[in-house]
Amino acid sequence: RDRGQVVKVLQDAVAASRNEKQNSQAMTHAWLFTGPPGSGRSNAAVAFAAALICENGGCGECSNCKSAIAGTHSDVELIKTEGLSIKIDEIRDLITRAAWAPAVSRYRVVVIEDADRLTESAANALLKAIEEPGAHTVWLLCAPTATDVLPTIRSRVRTLVLRTPSVNSVASLLEKEGFSKTISDFAARAAQGHIGRARFLAKSDVARSRRESILKVALSISDIASAFKSAAALVDAAKEEAEEESERRDEAELKALREAWGQTGTRLVQGGAKAIKELERDQKARSTRMIRDYLDSALLDIVTLFRDVLLVQSGSKEAIINSDLTAEIEKVAASTTPESTLGKIEAIMVARTNLAHNAAPLLTVEAMMVQLK
């Protein structure tokens, strides 16, 4: 569906939720928002949640809307996993909270941003909750595609498919936000329509410089030795970025938790030590996911490079994404064939799939880099 159709479906659902005389089929207790990264599936789910608990049907200005979007409303729970999976214990606790009566609204709304990361046991536990819904509970699940959730869950939710906005639309949005046309056009092309990624590239000189370094690493491969060297450089960069982010967040989280458990000196009240161990476990899982997410983003950037090579090989230069590397791209295009370029793109996509299935990062990237030489 296009965005206009999705908005209309959600508007009808909000209207039906506020007026029992309207078509009851427009509103249901469980929804699945699907779409590729950058399609806005999570933003759409959160906006829908805000509209459901808004006294005005989603004005975007009231305290209910603002707190729901900020993730601080008592009747809207946003589940954002920073680990590799969502486990059954987390879902059991969530189901218990979801059954509580709304505090100030008509509904208690639960948004699960990464429903595709549910373990099988967690998904089965969630299925039971969806099969036996509370009168005032609404479940909003988000995933890349409908096939990323259990078939039994798919059959019990209403699915909405969102599409990635066009590059031109994203560039126009960035210009309206105050970025120059040059930066907006580049960021939109480089992000291939992913609004969040495009905004990040537009804002950050460091991000643009890091992206250029990644592409130059891919261009530097000439033999097996350089392939292994490039793989190590990419994985080391991912680990370094994850460590920087972890250091920034971990100590503050531990300090806040110790204060919450009443630590004085080296002593914690009963249960505090267990809570700290659980936090440290979650922080380790988050760091692992950050490494994989960084690598996945880097591989997507490298895909754009070989996409450009393929365009040049096909006789077209108008839609090149990495125009600042045109000379290097033309050199690669002249020395290779379209068939080999397609093989390289396939190797990158296989590596992305393997990383998503928890393959060892260094071995995965090494295998890919060897095929890019």
Locations of the language-model features?
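Charged, glycine-rich active-site and insertion segments that engage polyanionic ligands
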Residues: 1-50, 67, 135-137, 144-298, ...
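Clamp-loader machinery-focused feature within the broader ASCE/P-loop NTPase space
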Residues: 1-121, 128-131
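Short capping loops/turns at secondary-structure boundaries
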Residues: 84, 116-119, 142, 146, ...
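Conserved catalytic/switch belt of AAA+ P-loop NTPases
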Residues: 99, 124-141, 151
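Conserved D-loop beta-strand region of ABC ATPase nucleotide-binding domains
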Residues: 110, 140-143
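Conserved phosphate-interacting/catalytic interface
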Residues: 302
